[in-house]
Design a protein with these regions (language model features):
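C-terminal transmembrane helical hairpin of 12-TM major facilitator-type secondary transporters
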Residues: 289-343
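A late C-terminal transmembrane helix in Major Facilitator Superfamily
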Residues: 345-384, 391
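Helix-to-loop junctions at the C-terminal end of transmembrane segments
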Residues: 61-73, 279-290, 379-380
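Conserved MFS/SLC helix-loop-helix module at the cytosolic interface between two early adjacent transmembrane helices
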Residues: 60-99
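Helix-loop-helix hairpin linking two adjacent transmembrane segments in secondary transporters
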Residues: 129, 137-201
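Flexible cytoplasmic inter-helical loops of multi-pass small-molecule transporters
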Residues: 194-218
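Extracytoplasmic gate region of multi-pass secondary transporters
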Residues: 30, 226-273, 277
Length: 409
């Protein structure tokens, strides 16, 4: 088999594994919010604000990482990010004050924040005719980190005797143990990526900057003069706010507002990510029938599921109904994501693709970063249901604007 082709698939597999680990460590936190609150005696607003700090740093790294990748290629950026995230994860393993936990979360946010913009740019260049399908594969593997994270948390918090004996040897509380696994794997993947992809034409050649013709910052900002581009950014911002708000507090929402057991709530949380394979379908389908029909359907399903989730506590339908609604939200939200990335890569000029995608992801992740803090504050003030109603409105707005773009295409 041709070595360049092996390199292409190596790139897809390795960057997807790094993305899996980035999602895994991000989604370790929400199922651990209750344990963190018990350990430190902090409120919903406090843990939500801490997670907002994590996500804000993540968001702020989107544009710089894309711009640097436009100049230097993606491999160095991906390797550096994995090493930084690994260091932050290892820091959490040790018992420390709450401020130290927040600082480590910020470091992890910085390390994971450089990855997605760079990996989307890389995959779009390697697979120009199958961008939707390959981004679907990439996002599917990444989202499986969200399936694994709550399952690992449940295993650690209700550890059988053999596992409990191992956890007892660790320097910190049991709930910190998953971060040791994350840190070790992050360092290992960073080394594998550096060794396997450095110098690979598939991984570096297509995405390196061309000569000294580096884009200026003003060129990225001029992208927003295109009304359709700006409108689609609004779609992504509305989606991101709703999605990030839900994934930050869904376990607590299900246990407190829907009155489910904590272990049940954490397992239902994993359903959001267990349906991630829909991305393989929606990515490929969008290559065939167009981006907007798929995006509008996915956003509409996610918005409907959020409305149903807000209604569940008043109906008293229990865990089975909650599982159906959570799975529906997962189908809609995951179904949207690879198509969004593919459409953005089509909108962006070739020379601005990395930094341009970084600008958009900074905005959408910035909005998403504000969501956990907003949900936590509203939940403490008036309850979780009004907070989740706000998320439903944000997702509904995204669906309506996307439908308008489709109708005027």
């Amino acid at each position: 088999m041709d070595r360049d082709r092996i390199g292409e698939y190596d790139a897809l597999v390795l960057v997807s594994l790094v993305w899996f680990l980035g999602k895994f460590v991000r989604y370790l936190f929400p199922p651990l919010f209750e344990s963190i609150q018990e350990a430190y005696g902090v409120s919903n607003a406090t843990v939500g604000t801490a997670f907002t700090g994590f996500m804000l740093v993540y968001a702020l790294l989107q544009f710089p990482s894309g711009a640097v990748a436009d100049r230097l290629g993606p491999v160095r950026v991906i390797v550096a990010g994995a090493l930084v995230a690994g260091a932050g994860s290892l820091a959490i393993v040790f018992d420390a004050p709450f401020a130290a936990l927040v600082a480590a979360m910020v470091v992890i946010g910085a390390g994971t924040g450089v990855h997605k913009t760079v990996s989307v740019r890389l995959i779009a260049r390697v697979y120009p005719a199958r961008t939707g399908r390959m981004l679907g594969a990439h996002d599917t593997l990444g989202a499986m980190g969200g399936v694994a994270a709550p399952a690992v948390v449940v295993a650690v918090l209700s550890a059988p005797p053999a596992l409990a004996a191992v956890l007892a040897r660790l320097p910190g509380a049991d709930w910190r143990a998953p971060f040791l696994l994350t840190g070790v794997l992050a360092v290992g993947l960073a080394v594998a990526t550096a060794v396997r992809l450095s110098g690979s034409p598939a991984a570096t050649g297509p995405t390196d900057a061309d000569g000294d013709d580096s884009p200026e910052a003003q060129e990225y900002l001029r992208l927003f003069r295109n009304p359709r581009f700006s409108a689609f950014v609004l779609v992504t911002v509305g989606f991101s706010f709703a999605h990030n708000g839900l994934v930050a507090f869904l376990p607590l929402y299900l246990s407190e507002a829907a009155d489910l057991a904590t272990s049940t709530a954490n397992l239902l949380y994993s359903l959001v990510f267990a349906v991630t394979f829909v991305q393989l379908v929606t990515g490929d389908l969008s290559d065939r029938v167009g981006r907007f029909p798929v995006m509008v359907a996915a956003l509409g399903l996610a918005a409907t599921a959020l409305v149903a989730l807000v209604s569940l506590p008043g109906l008293g339908l229990g865990a089975v109904a909650a599982a159906v609604v959570v799975a529906a939200f997962g189908l809609g939200s995951h179904g949207f994501q690879p198509v969004r990335s593919a459409y953005l890569m089509e909108l962006l000029p070739e020379r601005l693709a990395g930094g341009g995608l970084g600008v958009v992801r900074t905005l959408l992740m910035g909005a998403g970063a504000l969501a956990p803090g907003a949900v936590g504050v509203i939940a403490d003030a008036v309850g979780f249901r009004p907070a989740f109603a706000l998320l439903a409105g944000s997702m509904g707005l995204a669906a309506v604007v996307a439908a308008g773009l489709w109708l005027t295409e």
